[in-house]
């Protein structure tokens, strides 16, 4: 949580201890941590940029995300971006850390395709 959240040196700056434990238990109790990591393993094994997305896409770049795509990279691999936005806060768990900001990003993106 420390490396992947938007915190000031302490994960509890981004999420409460209860929130972190709740999330960890969702993976620990049913034993699904390994299967949830499969997406990452498969994506990196085949190369993140090996497939072009020709469909309209929205890209939100959070400052503490583990991979932050540049506009140039997005234009190369996603030739139909309808939204590209660099945000001031949020990390890999942006929907969890900044739910209102994340919801606004989704709304603003889909407002362009109505």
Give, region by region, the residue ranges found by the protein language model.
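C-terminal subdomain of alpha/beta-hydrolase-fold enzymes, centered on the catalytic histidine
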Residues: 1-114
């Amino acid at each position: 949580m420390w490396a992947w959240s938007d915190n000031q040196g302490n994960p509890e700056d981004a999420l409460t201890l209860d929130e972190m434990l709740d999330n960890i238990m969702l993976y620990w109790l049913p034993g699904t941590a390994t299967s949830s990591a499969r997406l990452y393993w498969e994506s990196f094994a085949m190369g993140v940029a090996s497939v072009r997305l020709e469909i309209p896409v929205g890209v939100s770049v959070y400052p503490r995300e583990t991979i932050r795509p540049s506009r140039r990279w997005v234009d190369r691999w996603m030739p139909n971006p309808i939204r590209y936005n660099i945000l001031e806060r949020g990390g890999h768990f942006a929907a969890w850390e900044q739910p209102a900001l994340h919801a606004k990003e989704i709304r603003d993106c889909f407002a362009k395709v109505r």
